[in-house]
């Protein structure tokens, strides 16, 4: 009897995505790649997520690819792919829970503004900000160095 129960539960255990922090260091944004047609219509939970929930997430976009199975593509600041997560077998609640675990900010309404502390979420900060601030900072000279002694 136990082998039968184990065999029945194995697919659900395999399909659950576990967040690997080391693999996803540098996670900054994501996109959902899926077809827009009949294949998505057969997956009610995923279609509900795509049509109703994606507009609520900051730094999450949708890309239509004809014939593609729905996948969540995790990207870093340079749009380099970190991981792909198949969404076909997941429920809407599981997808939303996964995005929350990954640190994505979900707005209440699509037109709501993103609070400043979540501007870069799921990333903690921007790698470009330190470069911009150091490049924009003018070099200061000591007043004693700028005085002419020959006058």
UniProtKB/Swiss-Prot annotation:
Assigned GO CC terms: endoplasmic reticulum lumen
Region Disordered, residue ranges: 115-151
Signal sequence coordinates: 1-16
Keywords recorded for this protein, A-Z: Selenocysteine, Signal
Position of the Cysteinyl-selenocysteine (Cys-Sec) cross-link: 35-38
Active site per database record: 35, 38
One Pfam family here: Sep15_SelM
Disulfide bonds, paired cysteine numbers: none
MF terms (GO), sorted A to Z: oxidoreductase activity
Coiled-coil zones: none
Gene3D superfamilies named among the record's database cross-references: Sep15/SelM thioredoxin-like domain, active-site redox motif (3.40.30.50)
Expressing tissues: During early embryogenesis, abundantly expressed within the notochord and anterior somites. At later stages, accumulates within the axial fin fold, dorsal spinal cord neurons, then in lateral line neuromasts.
Keyword Glycosyltransferase: no
Purpose of the protein: May function as a thiol-disulfide oxidoreductase that participates in disulfide bond formation.
Family affiliation: Belongs to the selenoprotein M/F family.
Protein name: Selenoprotein M
Lineage: Eukaryota, Metazoa, Chordata, Craniata, Vertebrata
Gene behind this protein: Selenom
């Amino acid at each position: 009897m136990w082998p039968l129960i184990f065999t029945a539960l194995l697919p659900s255990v395999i399909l659950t995505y576990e967040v690997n922090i080391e693999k996803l260091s540098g996670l900054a944004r994501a996109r959902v790649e899926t077809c827009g047609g009949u294949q998505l219509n057969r997956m009610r939970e995923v279609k509900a997520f795509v049509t109703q929930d994606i507009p609520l997430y900051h730094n999450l976009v949708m890309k239509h690819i004809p014939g593609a199975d729905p996948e969540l593509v995790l990207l870093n600041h340079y749009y380099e792919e970190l991981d792909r997560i198949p969404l076909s077998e997941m429920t809407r609640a599981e997808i939303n829970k996964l995005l929350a675990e990954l640190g994505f900010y979900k707005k209440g309404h699509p037109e709501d503004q993103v609070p400043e502390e979540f501007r870069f979420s799921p990333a903690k900060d921007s790698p470009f900000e330190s470069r911009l601030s150091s490049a924009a900072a003018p070099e200061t000279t000591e007043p004693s160095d700028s005085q002419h002694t020959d006058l």
